[in-house]
Each structure stands twice: as structure tokens, then as C-alpha cells.
């Protein structure tokens, strides 16, 4: 069997070593006589899996002791509702909109604000700029009394990334960040955030799991209408197991965390991600056949959208790429073109193979 280079934005490629270990343990996890999917979530075998996964994640991200790690269901999209339910507390929240996902989060919070007895403000948007850059400081309208400031630090569809949170003024308002498509791609200063959430299916593991890292002082403020299962405090008190969690997804996430540690930790992972993204961006910038329209200081290392000079060549490009073992390169339907998602599991050789194919395709069709 020959594996392809999978550039899917999510569910995305997983490290081959992780898949191999999961395959070896599918029928018998470490002598238990059954696989992880068959285990009771309250049995000692699975509780040890969860404990190790959390310990490894804490080590990778240097998570302080006053933060709780939650392994929840519903994906990042459920967090668009769960966050205001838990944090709005009858007050006001600020939202920054820099792409499709932060726009969706803002829309859901607006939808719920009235029922929660609060308000949601648009504190800055780059929609008129086509979501091709980050917000500038002078474009921000931040409320220092806001309950929280929500942002998406990597916009998967538009390929815009905030690598340095220091670009935002520190008003003392808790930062709430959707990091679904770049968490674990570089070291983080967790203490700068009140809450971080990330759908697993890009850089953590399979779909169906969302990881929430929340500062303890933000627990216990849920609206009275919040369903029990969506109350962060309740889930924290129950070790993410008020109900049956997505057990196999947590297991795979734990294997990914161990794999990241084996790569040398997040500093080494970041260096590899910079090398991969630089390789592709340098090629795009030198080409008059392909174009990336994101401002250079706003470009994502994980999701790189690009356009061909002639849209009529899109289908031949994708067909040729598939034949060359390069899959899932079609851009999101809302923006068109192509998109290469090069998460942690994508090796440098995969990006080199893509660049080689793109160079050959442009030579034949330019």
C-alpha cells in the first residue's frame, strides 16, 4: 500500500507512527484483552489513558496548575455556544472577526446573547479586506469591561494566523481563543489566555473531540439556562466524564501528544513547521502562475490558500495532483482556488513533493 500526502484541512493527516501503534493495539491494548473502543470509560485502563494524555498535554504546552484541561464532545462549533453560556454572565463580550470561523463564533454568540441577558460587540473585523490580513491596532474597539475577548488565532479557510498575541493590547480582559487549526504547532504562553479551545481533527486527533484549557477563576459563572453537560465547572469537577466521553479520540490524541514529545517538543515542531511553510510560500511568491493573497505578516503556517492564474486549470491541477499522490488540495467553496493544509503530521517531503508538482504543472500550462 502506498500512502498519499493528505493536505486536508480536517479531518487531517495523522502521524504514521500513531496510526501504526493504534493498529497494533486495536484488538488488545497493552494486554487488556480488548481494544480501547471496547473499554469502560470508568475502568482503570481508560482512566490511565486519560490521565497520561492530560499529563503529556500539560508538559507540551507548559500549562500552569491553575488551568483545567477538559476533553469534551461537540467539536469547536459547540464551543461557539458553550463559551457565552459559561462566560457572558449577563455582561458584554467583545469579538474579533478575521475569517469565516470567528464570524461564525460571533454570530452564535449574538444569537444567544439576549437569552443569556448579555450583549455581544463586534470589536474589529477585516471582512471588508476580504479576510486577507490581521486587524491593525488602530482598528480595534476594545471594551476594558468586557467579560472576555474572543478571537480565532488561525483562520483555516482564509489562511490568516496570529502568531504573537502580544500584537493585541493587554486590557486585562480574559482572552478566549479558538486555536483549532494551529494548536500544538508552536510553544504558547498559556498564561496570556483565559480559555483556549481546539477541535481535535486538525492537529490533535480524530473528529468528535474538542480540547478546552480554561483558567480556574472562569469556572462557576454559567448562566442558569446552561445545560448541565455544557457547564465547564461541572465537567471539570467530573474529570470530563459526566457522561461517556469520546474515548477512542482521546486515546489517539494521547498518542499524538507522545509523538510530539518524541519529535523534541513544540520548539522543534515549530522549527519544522516554519521550514515547511517557508518552502511553499517562497515558491508561491516567486511564481507568476500561482498567487497567495494573504498579507505577509498575517500568513498561516498551517493553512496556505492559493489561486491559479486561470480558474479553468483548477480541475486539471487537482486531477494531476491526485495522480501524483497529493490529495485534498481543493480550496474551501467560499473562497475557491486551492488550499494546502500542512499540519504537524505533514512531513517536509510532502511539501517538497507539492512544490515539485506545482512547478511542473505551471511549466506545462504556463
Swiss-Prot record:
Q: In which pathway does it act?
A: Amino-acid biosynthesis; L-serine biosynthesis; L-serine from 3-phospho-D-glycerate: step 2/3; Cofactor biosynthesis; pyridoxine 5'-phosphate biosynthesis; pyridoxine 5'-phosphate from D-erythrose 4-phosphate: step 3/5
Q: Which residues carry this modification: N6-(pyridoxal phosphate)lysine?
A: 202
Give the record's keywords alphabetically.
Amino-acid biosynthesis, Aminotransferase, Cytoplasm, Pyridoxal phosphate, Pyridoxine biosynthesis, Serine biosynthesis, Transferase
Cofactor(s) needed:
pyridoxal 5'-phosphate
GO cellular component terms listed in the entry, alphabetical order: cytoplasm
**What is the top EC class of this enzyme, as a single word?**
transferase
Stated EC number for the protein is 2.6.1.52
- Where is this chain primarily localised? cytoplasm
Q: State the compartments where it is located.
A: Cytoplasm
Q: For binding L-glutamate, which residues are annotated in this chain's numbering?
A: 42
- Where, by residue number, does pyridoxal 5'-phosphate bind? 76-77, 101, 156, 178, 201, 243-244
Q: How is the cofactor bound?
A: Binds 1 pyridoxal phosphate per subunit.
**Lineage: superkingdom:** Bacteria
Q: Which reaction does it catalyse?
A: O-phospho-L-serine + 2-oxoglutarate = 3-phosphooxypyruvate + L-glutamate; 4-(phosphooxy)-L-threonine + 2-oxoglutarate = (R)-3-hydroxy-2-oxo-4-phosphooxybutanoate + L-glutamate
Among Pfam families, the record links this protein to: Aminotran_5
Kindly list the GO molecular function terms attached to this UniProt entry. Answer: O-phospho-L-serine:2-oxoglutarate aminotransferase activity; pyridoxal phosphate binding
Which BP terms in the Gene Ontology apply to this protein?
Answer: L-serine biosynthetic process; pyridoxine biosynthetic process
Among NCBIfam families, the record links this protein to: PRK05355.1, serC_1
Q: Subunit structure, briefly?
A: Homodimer.
Give the similarity note.
Answer: Belongs to the class-V pyridoxal-phosphate-dependent aminotransferase family. SerC subfamily.
Q: Which PANTHER family match?
A: PHOSPHOSERINE AMINOTRANSFERASE
Descriptive protein name: Phosphoserine aminotransferase
Name the species this protein comes from. Answer: Aromatoleum aromaticum (strain DSM 19018 / LMG 30748 / EbN1) (Azoarcus sp. (strain EbN1))
Instruction: Recite the lineage of the species.
Output: Bacteria, Pseudomonadati, Pseudomonadota, Betaproteobacteria, Rhodocyclales
The gene for this chain is: serC
